[in-house]
């Protein structure tokens, strides 16, 4: 399982899984787009590069999702395919390629307002990583 949606009053929450950080960031992007737009009608029209960094994995994933929200809001862009490289060192850096296209208003399931820090967390487990994300709608 890559991700699952969780009942959450007045927000959308999802739990994301990855055997490594690359997979966690890729699956977080797929969960984000699946939550808010019907991607079945979107073709792969272009590739968008996204980079972000932070002092730890949680902050970097939070910033990653905010970059996706920015593209969603400003360019009406949704990805169907995602590739991410995550580097750990002096902080954490994520560099990704999003492949997808524009969506129309009819394709939007619900409009996201903000990625919240409420209950936001990333945990390392014996199977990899788990992240819990709440998005204000």
UniProtKB/Swiss-Prot annotation:
Any single GO BP term: tRNA splicing, via endonucleolytic cleavage and ligation
InterPro entries for the chain: Archease, Archease_arc, Archease_dom, Archease_dom_sf
Molecular functions (GO terms): calcium ion binding
Signal peptide positions on this chain: none
HAMAP family, per database record: Archease_arch
Entry similarity comment: Belongs to the archease family.
PANTHER family: ARCHEASE, PROTEIN ARCHEASE
Protein's name according to its UniProt entry: Protein archease
